[in-house]
């Protein structure tokens, strides 16, 4: 096979990863493609230069297939001809899918620790590169849930710790509980969902990677229609001969060197297009037009 494309990199903890990651969720939940197409999609992302893949044990459809997405990713990496050691796989625990279409939480430390060890087995690794507490559990004190990550770090089960779906106060609390070892925050962020801007800014101040999930607006049509809903991205895309999705991702990358979007994909062509955003060089005027259209004031 030919060598993978090399993309610009950004940093999570002490690891350099591609500026655009791959979100694995769409390949394992409602509307998921078959196994062959999923493997081909992951291979396409790797060949396009993506070296950061995000998954979770809760990315599955039926109650008896916990870790479906982790298993897919492990299989794809094992059958890929490139350097698997160059790829950082991030997973999560603390979310559950009972199998009836709902999502629930289990933030108990004992669950998080057991789930992480099970994830490591499914991924076929001695230590998980990045493990994230998936979502706060209202029935468990946040510090107790994050405390499980401390134990996992100290035991060598995970190499780095992150959190997801967190508020600014929870970010600060996690950083304190982890003794400064928090490396990433993964929150929803896109042109249509910008309520995580305080978290994005706080991560910049703290030197923590910010990982936007659903950076194009989600798999329910938001990603596909982003150029229709936000015409400036389509206009700039036409001017540059690229998709509006690439413009959105390039704009998000411009918000800070700590921002690493993780668009999901069900098809190879989707992630191939998204990966190109890492090299898309928009002018200062074009970036300002994007921000102005969303009512965001940029600092000079």
Language model feature labels by segment:
Residues 59, 80-107:
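Structural motif corresponding to the early beta-alpha repeats
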Residues 15-20, 49-51, 82-87, 125-129, ...:
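Short, well-ordered coil/turn segments that N-cap beta-strands
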Residues 1-87:
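N-terminal binding-site loop/beta-alpha segment at the start of enzyme catalytic domains
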Residues 13-30, 90-103, 127, 132:
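N-terminal small/glycine-rich loop or linker at the start of catalytic domains
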Residues 33-46, 107-123, 169-172:
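Short, acidic/polar
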Residues 47, 111-132, 152-155, 177:
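CE4/NodB-like, metal-dependent polysaccharide N-deacetylase domain
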Residues 29, 59-63, 96-102, 218-222, ...:
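A short acidic, helix-capping loop that chelates divalent metal ions and anchors anionic groups
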Residues 4, 136-300:
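Beta/alpha (TIM)-barrel catalytic core signal, keyed to glycine-rich beta->alpha loops juxtaposed to Asp/Glu
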């Amino acid at each position: 096979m030919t060598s993978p494309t090399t993309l610009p990199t950004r940093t999570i903890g002490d690891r350099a990863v591609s500026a655009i990651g791959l979100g694995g969720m769409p390949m394992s939940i409602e509307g998921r493609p078959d196994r062959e197409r999923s493997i081909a999609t992951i291979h396409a992302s790797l060949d396009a230069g993506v070296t950061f893949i995000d998954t979770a044990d809760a990315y599955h459809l039926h109650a008896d297939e916990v870790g479906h997405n982790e298993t897919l990713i492990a299989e794809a990496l094992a059958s890929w001809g490139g350097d698997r050691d160059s790829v950082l796989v991030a997973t999560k625990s603390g979310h559950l899918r009972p199998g009836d279409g709902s999502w629930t939480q289990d933030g108990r430390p004992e669950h998080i620790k057991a789930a992480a060890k099970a994830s490591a087995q499914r991924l076929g690794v001695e230590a998980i590169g990045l493990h994230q507490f998936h979502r706060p559990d209202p029935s468990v004190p946040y510090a107790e849930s994050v405390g499980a990550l401390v134990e996992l770090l100290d035991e060598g089960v995970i190499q780095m710790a992150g959190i997801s779906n967190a508020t600014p106060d929870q970010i600060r609390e996690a950083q304190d509980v982890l003794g400064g070892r928090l490396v990433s925050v993964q929150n929803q962020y896109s042109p249509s969902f910008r309520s995580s801007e305080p978290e994005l800014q706080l991560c910049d101040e703290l030197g923590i990677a910010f990982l936007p999930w659903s950076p194009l607006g989600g798999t329910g049509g938001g990603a596909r229609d982003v150029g229709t809903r936000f015409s400036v991205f389509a206009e700039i895309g036409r001017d540059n001969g690229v998709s509006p999705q690439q413009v959105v991702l390039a704009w998000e990358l411009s918000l800070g060197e700590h921002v690493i979007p993780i668009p999901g994909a069900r098809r190879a062509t989707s992630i191939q297009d998204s990966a190109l955003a890492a090299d898309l060089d928009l002018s200062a005027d074009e970036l300002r037009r994007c921000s102005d259209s969303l009512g965001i004031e940029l600092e000079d």
